[in-house]
Regions:
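Positively charged, low-complexity intrinsically disordered leader regions
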Residues: 1-25
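Short, solvent-exposed amphipathic alpha-helices that sit
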Residues: 19, 45-58, 168
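Short beta-strand elements in bilobed, periplasmic/extracellular small-molecule ligand-binding domains
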Residues: 56-67
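Short, well-structured alpha-helical segments in soluble
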Residues: 75-86
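Anion-binding alpha/beta catalytic cores of soluble intermediary-metabolism enzymes, centered on
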Residues: 93-159
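Single conserved hydrophobic/aromatic residue that forms the stacking wall/gate
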Residues: 166-175
Length: 175
């Protein structure tokens, strides 16, 4: 079975665009996502470009903060502290991987839980494993939505998920 995600992606974007339209009525401004990109890894640059394009398409204000690979951990943490304190910033995304001299766990934990759009904050990960409400990591959430919307029956089936991401909850945990 081959499943195409194009229709689902289009439907998700349309729904998100409608939700974004109502945001200013409630908050007096557009939602604002800030992506922090450290270094010039080609894959990361491409991924961030895709994220900002998707945000633009649905009307989300977005800012990319680009820093050189030799930024200090202290400088990066200061940027996160400033974003956490900024009430006009609704979501923070740190593009991974970070350079080896920066502790990714420390950086991710520094983001306020409610501004963590990736679902990688330790409290979001803990809530996920405990099946509590939380920000769900997008990849397993997307997999489960795609399977569900495609009518794939998962009950009684077994699957193996091989994941090399920062955090790797199974798609089952995101259903």
């Amino acid at each position: 079975m081959v499943i195409s995600g194009k229709e689902l992606a289009a439907a998700c974007k349309a729904k998100m665009a409608e939700q974004v339209k109502t945001f200013p009525e409630k908050y007096g401004r557009l939602p604002h996502l800030v992506v922090v990109l450290v270094g010039e890894d080609a894959g990361s640059v491409s991924y961030v470009t895709g994220k900002t394009k998707a945000a633009d398409e649905v009307g989300i204000l977005n800012t990319t903060i680009r820093k050189p690979a030799d930024i200090s951990e202290e400088e990066l943490l200061k940027i996160i502290d400033d974003l956490n304190a900024d009430d006009t910033v609704d979501g923070i995304l740190i593009q991974l991987p970070l350079p080896k001299h920066i502790d990714s766990d420390k950086v991710i934990a520094r983001i306020r839980q409610e501004k963590d759009v990736d679902g990688f904050h330790p409290l979001n990960v803990a809530a996920l494993w405990q099946k509590q409400p939380c920000v769900l990591p997008c990849t397993p959430k997307g997999i489960m939505k795609l399977l569900k919307d495609s009518g794939v029956e998962l009950a009684g089936r077994k699957a193996v998920v091989i994941c090399l991401l920062y955090t790797s909850p199974s798609p089952r945990d995101c259903s």
